[in-house]
């Protein structure tokens, strides 16, 4: 492992979050300007990340061993769940504001705590359960304007709330699969085979109706894949230089970026309930990270292999 350099790890983490957030903004733009469906977005996001990942492995001299796997079906399960989560998150971007989708996405690490107890038999005690409760309360606050039952409620925003929450649950379940895979598999293999699987699954949605993109939309779609691959490399590198418990909280920089991009690019001013709810979710997430550090639970390899979307 490289010499520990916490500042470099933090900077790499912030860079990865920034690139992932810009990538998500590009995806949202293709939804708003060209009505590109989520399956098509997943295909381009995944396909054009693969060359970036392969070049990175080749430069590190790991192309031969980096893709080797002893758990092919594990990658399939993780790929299917992660692809569904990514598609739901991309769909949510078409239905809700950028800050709303970002805030709801923070439910994923909270749900991981619950899923780890359910599926991995992990011992989860009062403190972390309390933080999960606080965080999910924050998520409900963010969701509350969309879940009103009045006659004037916007059905598309209601659908967006459900879709975004489904994406967060899918991302959490994908993290459970990754947590099992990292016990035997290299991070590079997990990242590559997820991109490969999601490319195939994204392509399978072609019969359900894709759009023919104009030049600008095509550049945004291709760019989202390239940026997605670059962000994954930055994320993986961040955890090589600093402990997960130090680096992971900087995930929440994405909220500031989402607010700025939503405001300046999409004309979306964050509602007060979003800011209040997001604050509770972020507080709970940071406290869970702190508690896992106290308990000596190592999450670096799992976090290296995950993306913000699934």
What is the role of each PLM region?
Residues 21, 25, 53, 149-210, ...:
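Transmembrane alpha-helical segments that form core, pore/gating elements
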């Amino acid at each position: 492992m490289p010499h520990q350099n916490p500042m470099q790890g933090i900077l790499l983490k912030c860079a990865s979050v920034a690139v992932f957030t810009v990538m998500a903004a590009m995806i949202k733009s293709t939804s708003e300007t060209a009505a590109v469906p989520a399956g098509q977005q997943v295909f381009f996001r995944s396909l054009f990340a693969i060359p970036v990942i392969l070049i990175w492995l080749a430069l590190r001299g790991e192309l031969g061993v980096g893709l080797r796997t002893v758990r092919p079906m594990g990658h399939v399960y993780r790929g299917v769940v992660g692809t569904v989560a990514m598609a739901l998150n991309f769909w949510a971007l078409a239905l809700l504001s950028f800050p709303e989708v970002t805030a709801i996405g923070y439910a994923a690490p909270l749900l991981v705590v619950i899923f780890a107890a359910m599926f991995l038999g992990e011992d989860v005690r009062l403190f972390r359960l309390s933080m999960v409760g606080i965080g999910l309360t924050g998520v409900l606050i963010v969701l509350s304007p969309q879940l009103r039952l009045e006659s004037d409620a916007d059905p598309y925003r209601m659908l967006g709330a459900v879709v975004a929450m489904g994406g967060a649950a899918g991302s959490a379940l994908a993290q459970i699969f990754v947590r099992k895979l990292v016990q035997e598999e290299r991070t590079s293999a997990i990242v590559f085979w997820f991109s490969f699987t999601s490319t195939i699954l994204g392509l399978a949605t072609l019969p359900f109706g894709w759009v023919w993109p104009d030049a600008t939309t095509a550049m945004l779609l291709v760019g989202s894949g390239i940026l997605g691959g670059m962000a994954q490399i930055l994320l993986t590198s961040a955890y090589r230089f600093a402990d997960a418990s130090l680096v992971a909280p900087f995930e929440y920089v994405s909220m500031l970026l989402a607010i700025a991009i939503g405001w300046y690019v999409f004309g979306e001013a964050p509602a007060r309930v979003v800011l209040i709810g997001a604050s509770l979710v972020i507080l709970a997430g940071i406290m869970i990270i702190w508690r896992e550090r106290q308990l000596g639970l190592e999450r670096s390899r799992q976090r290296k292999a995950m993306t913000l979307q699934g």
